[in-house]
Amino acid sequence: MPSRFFVTGTDTGVGKTVVSATLCAALDAIYWKPVQTGTREGTDRATVMRIAGIAPKRTAPEVYRFSPPVSPHLAARLAGKRILLRNINLPKIAPQESLIAEGAGGALVPLNERDLTTALMKRLGLPVLLVTRTSLGTINHTLLSVAALRAARLNLHGVIMVGKTNIENRKAIEHYGQVRVLGRLPLLPQLDRKALIKAFNSHFDRTAFVG
């Protein structure tokens, strides 16, 4: 059964792309970032191909690409465009293929003057993985994001933490958020396919990512 998820985070820079690359490498999934900003500094698609060791054919092209490293709604406006949800549809892939879709920033990042990223998640209908830090402040940030996802009536599949071990923060998130923490991705000294797969096998239960 294929694994298909939408990856969001509590903040920009929290580790969504590395988590997405890890899942693509470990689950042999296709990578897709429908809305990409900051292309002048490179794309997350290129990063995932490089560190996960996957070919271009194992990725789907972005629907919207913008050069400035700013929020999608602003990047589109600066380009004289508007992001339309109706233009963003799941890529056409074989039924048996797994898919990892990565959002731009967090769950409440605006895409246009009306729609937030939660609206895109709802349109795509994929179970959501929330990426969060393990460090101080993560409880508040994670619980706020969990509340936002549930308010939007999205299927929150679980939380993935990134960073050093912090058992107390993990327990607090599971208790107060009533959500599963699926595992923790440590800060890796080297980012390549072998290291990502090893980290996944050491810190996650593969069965938690089935369908």
Language-model features: locations:
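C-terminal lobe/tail of nucleotide-utilizing enzymes
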Residues: 146-211
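Hydrophobic anchor at the beta1->P-loop junction of P-loop NTPases
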Residues: 7-8
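Short, structured coil segments at secondary-structure junctions
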Residues: 52, 124, 176-179
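Inter-motif core of Ras-like GTPase G domains
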Residues: 112-135
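Short internal beta-strands
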Residues: 33-34, 129-132, 157-163
